[in-house]
Amino acid sequence: MNIDILFLNQELKASDDFINDLSLFEEYCKTHSFEGKANQIIAMPASYSRKNNLTYLVGLGEIEDSQELYELGIKVGSKIKEDVEIDFLNAENNIVPIIDGILYAQYKFNDYKSEDESAINNITFNQTDTTENEIKQSSIFWVRDQINTPLSLIHI
């Protein structure tokens, strides 16, 4: 599944480059109280998008700090429930912390669950090299698994 993440500030600038009908878009934003404030996230139907993909509208507000971008990425990542390919639209900020947040939000401790229920989502970022992010994700997930494994089961 392809999804787009459209970053917007409070002026909702650049939305006309990615939206089919601006008047419908503005009505949709008003109906869902989306104003582009920091940490606001809503899903916009694919029919509103020029690329016909499900699009998450992500409000940046005045966010510029890497930690705030990371936390925003966690919020976006928590909404992803399946394998996806992601395109970032209107991304003017440093997206590395956002990518980290999206990837780290996918963590699941799978040791005591069946494979069908517990597979970690495969997320691909189009137009972005995420090799370093994926290496960090793998390391962090390994550490989290070690922390969650009872000491009696760890083979030293």
Task: Identify the residue ranges that each predicted region occupies.
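Short amphipathic alpha-helical segment within the helicase RecA-like ATPase core
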Residues: 1-154
